[in-house]
């Protein structure tokens, strides 16, 4: 009888059970976080006011340059688990430090920070604030006039060593801390992700289409094109190209909605730039028809 060598046996034998993947080699959570960030960037583009600009991956994940010359830095964080956001969370600490550096220690008065996340607000460990409030909730209370002292103590205990922590430790006046730091930071927590986030984008697209007198019904199909456009712009190596405006959005929507011209899709509504006509001027005849037929018959 014919006997197989050990190597031949190993190569031809079938595994007795499914292959086991290594979870450490998987990055689904990272991909999910990038998708959340880019979707929030797309939503910001659709909600952009007239005269503003959207900057992508410049100071933070995205920034809004306002018509008045201000800059709103937006750090986006997503968690697929049950993690919560506190003032001790690395994402929060890093965003505060970056804001402080970018705003030149708060001296540039028209720079602000938004921390946008799907995470809920959590409580800091080892710290007790008035009313057992969380750090982020108490931050909002300080904006409304609550005592700044407990929040300053919390920040000094949680912030990494650096300029911001040193400045707070120097005991600056409360009104200066409020003006340069507290009043400039917005915490947008528990933001929708997944299908609810997608629904927000679709609704914003539908509103823009209606304003441009384009069919609202195209909004679901355009969502992927908007997302892809954000990815392309975010991938540009030249920072000057990672900028979008409302004019860019309107031009893009007109382009993607009007593919396959002429004719458009069924039920198309007439755009504001179209002009109705009752007749079209045609070029004059070069010769009478009977003359032409006579000449042809004689040839």
Question: What are the functions of these language-model segments?
Answer:
Residues 23-26, 30-101:
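Catalytic centers of nucleases
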Residues 1-30, 78-299:
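Acidic metal-coordinating catalytic centers involved in nucleic-acid phosphodiester chemistry
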């Amino acid at each position: 009888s014919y006997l197989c060598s050990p190597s031949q046996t190993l190569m031809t034998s079938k595994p007795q059970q499914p292959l086991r993947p290594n979870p450490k080699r998987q990055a689904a959570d990272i991909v999910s976080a990038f998708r959340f960030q880019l979707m929030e960037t797309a939503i910001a583009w659709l909600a952009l006011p007239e005269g503003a600009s959207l900057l992508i991956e410049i100071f933070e994940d995205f920034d809004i340059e306002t018509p008045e010359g201000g800059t709103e830095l937006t750090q986006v964080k997503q968690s697929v688990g049950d993690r919560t956001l506190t003032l001790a969370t690395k994402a929060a600490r890093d965003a505060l430090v970056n804001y402080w550096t970018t705003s030149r220690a708060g001296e540039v008065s028209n720079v602000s920070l938004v921390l946008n996340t799907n995470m809920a607000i959590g409580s800091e460990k080892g710290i007790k604030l008035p009313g057992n409030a969380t750090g982020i909730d108490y931050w909002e209370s300080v904006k409304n006039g609550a005592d700044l002292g407990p929040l300053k103590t919390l920040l000094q205990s949680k912030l990494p060593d650096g300029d911001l922590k040193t400045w707070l430790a120097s005991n600056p006046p409360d009104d200066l801390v409020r003006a340069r730091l507290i009043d400039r930071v917005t915490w947008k927590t528990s933001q929708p992700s997944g299908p609810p986030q997608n629904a927000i984008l679709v609704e914003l697209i539908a509103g823009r289409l209606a304003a441009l007198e384009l069919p609202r019904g195209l909004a679901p199909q355009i969502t992927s094109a908007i997302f892809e456009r954000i990815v392309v712009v975010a991938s540009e190596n030249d920072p000057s190209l990672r900028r979008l405006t409302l004019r860019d959005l309107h031009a893009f929507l007109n382009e993607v909605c009007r593919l396959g011209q002429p004719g458009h899709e069924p039920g198309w509504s007439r755009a504001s730039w179209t002009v109705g006509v009752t007749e079209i001027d045609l070029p004059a005849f070069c010769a009478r028809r009977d003359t032409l037929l006579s000449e042809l018959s004689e040839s």
